[in-house]
């Protein structure tokens, strides 16, 4: 059996509201083929000149400045861009075309692409027209129109930002995704959600008890979590469309659910003795026992194709990361460095697994390892307890909990450990973040 500090650390510190995008994009310029940005030699980011949005008659300039700030902050958050201020002589007209933009001036400051837009309002509706030009050729690469109400300006701006990322990189962005996490700001441990950048925090549960380890199904229909309202940890599954919560009653304890796909999830049960991993359907019915060992098995996380599952087991003595293969039904040990490896998180790209290591000096640090056991890399160091890593949907970032400034808060970093910074600032402590898949 694992020592109690491991169980306590994992369980006590281990809805997403899938609101559809209210902005409805309408193509201005057809872009049937993806354009993949080529970075300049020696550069690790895309040099993008972002201009302040223009406004039509009757539209508040402050609204355009707000939209520009939302786009700039969002693109900067991704870590993909070097954002440049436009030169003073970049435009000869508020009507954007290749003939009214000074591409030589843009090239002189190192810009590879130029993003600009127009904001207009009429009858309570606002329209954002966004365009991206290639500096080298002066050609329009991308353009779209987004409509909504003024209260939806953030969604409109992020819809444009997400399309810019997808068009220039060929990959989906984090815009529209959300993060679920645990906070005690209300006095008890409840589940909260926030946008990808820490904005729009919402409390999702109000049990006035303890809720832990939130996990959203890939289709956004269900939220699974560990529920203590009955006095012991039990699996709870909430159907988000109806708000109906099903508590799966089993003898013993249940902790730490994870979804294999939109209709199957795994969790740890102890009703047959040892704490083992089981596969369930979305209603909570057990379909299959996955592990059988003399030690505790917990913390499942699935490969993107659902064919493999990483988990934590003490079968070798101390907790280590193992990988279960559904085709063979066998498990193999993945980690051999470190005596206390926990909280695995499989990258959505499929090539790496992040996890936490409890080190002898008292620090907890986050590492990543290739799925074949090679390439062990430490991402955090000399910053207290860093735990519960969770990948962004595009695999470019990791959100995690850290007490580096005292109380545990949420932080984000790039997948290589660079640019570690706080995600949000709210009262209480925040732990156990889980980054959702793309909103649908």
Swiss-Prot record:
The answer to keyword Transmembrane applying to this record is no
Family label: Belongs to the TolB family.
List the GO terms this entry assigns under cellular component, sorted alphabetically.
Answer: periplasmic space
Q: Name one GO biological process term.
A: protein import
Tell me the first and last residues of the signal peptide: 1-30
UniProt name for this protein: Protein TolB homolog
Q: Which UniProt keywords apply?
A: Periplasm, Signal
Is the keyword Iron in the record? no
This chain is encoded by the gene named: tolB
Q: Which residues, by range, are in coiled-coil regions?
A: none
Origin species:
Chlorobium chlorochromatii (strain CaD3)
InterPro entries hit by this protein: 6-blade_b-propeller_TolB-like (IPR011042), PD40 (IPR011659), Tol-Pal_TolB (IPR014167), TolB_N (IPR007195)
> Subcellular localization, per the record?
Periplasm
């Amino acid at each position: 059996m694992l020592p109690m500090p491991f169980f306590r650390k994992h369980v006590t510190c281990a809805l997403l509201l899938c609101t559809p995008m209210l902005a409805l994009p309408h193509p201005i310029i057809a872009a049937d083929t993806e354009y993949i940005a080529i970075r300049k030699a020696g550069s690790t980011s895309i040099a993008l000149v972002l201009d302040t949005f223009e406004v039509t008659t009757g539209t508040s300039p402050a609204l355009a400045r707000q939209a520009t700030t939302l786009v700039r902050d969002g693109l900067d958050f991704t870590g993909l861009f070097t954002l440049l201020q436009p030169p003073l002589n970049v435009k000869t007209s508020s009507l954007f075309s290749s003939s009214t933009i000074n591409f030589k001036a843009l090239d002189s400051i190192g810009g590879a692409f130029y993003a600009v837009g127009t904001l207009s309002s009429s009858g309570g509706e606002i329209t954002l027209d966004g365009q991206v030009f290639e500096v080298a050729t002066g050609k329009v690469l991308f353009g779209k129109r987004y409509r909504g109400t003024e209260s939806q300006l953030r969604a409109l701006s992020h819809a444009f930002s997400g399309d810019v990322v997808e068009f220039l990189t060929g990959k989906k962005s984090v815009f529209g995704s959300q993060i679920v996490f645990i906070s005690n700001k209300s006095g008890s441990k409840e589940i909260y959600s926030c946008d990808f950048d820490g904005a729009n925090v919402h409390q999702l549960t109000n049990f006035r008890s303890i809720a832990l380890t939130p996990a959203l199904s890939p289709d956004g229909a269900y939220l699974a979590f560990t529920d203590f309202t009955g006095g012991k940890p039990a699996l709870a599954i909430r159907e988000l469309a109806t708000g109906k919560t099903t508590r799966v009653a089993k003898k013993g304890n249940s902790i730490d659910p994870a979804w294999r796909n939109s209709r199957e999830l795994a969790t740890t049960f102890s009703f047959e003795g040892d704490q083992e991993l089981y596969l369930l359907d979305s209603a909570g019915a057990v379909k299959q026992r996955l592990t059988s060992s003399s030690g505790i098995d917990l913390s499942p996380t699935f490969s993107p194709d659902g064919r493999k599952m990483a988990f934590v087991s003490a079968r070798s003595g101390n907790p280590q990361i193992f990988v279960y293969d559904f085709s063979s039904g066998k498990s193999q040990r993945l980690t051999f460095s470190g005596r206390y490896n926990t909280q695995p998180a499989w990258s959505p790209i499929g090539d790496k697994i992040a996890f936490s290591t409890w080190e002898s000096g008292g620090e907890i640090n986050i590492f990543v390892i290739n799925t074949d056991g090679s390439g062990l890399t430490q991402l955090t160091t000399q910053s207290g307890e860093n735990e519960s890593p969770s990948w962004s949907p595009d695999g470019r970032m990791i959100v995690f909990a850290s007490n580096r400034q005292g109380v545990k808060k949420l932080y984000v970093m790039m997948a290589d450990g660079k640019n570690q910074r706080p995600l949000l600032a709210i009262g209480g402590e925040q732990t156990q973040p889980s980054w959702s898949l793309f909103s649908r």
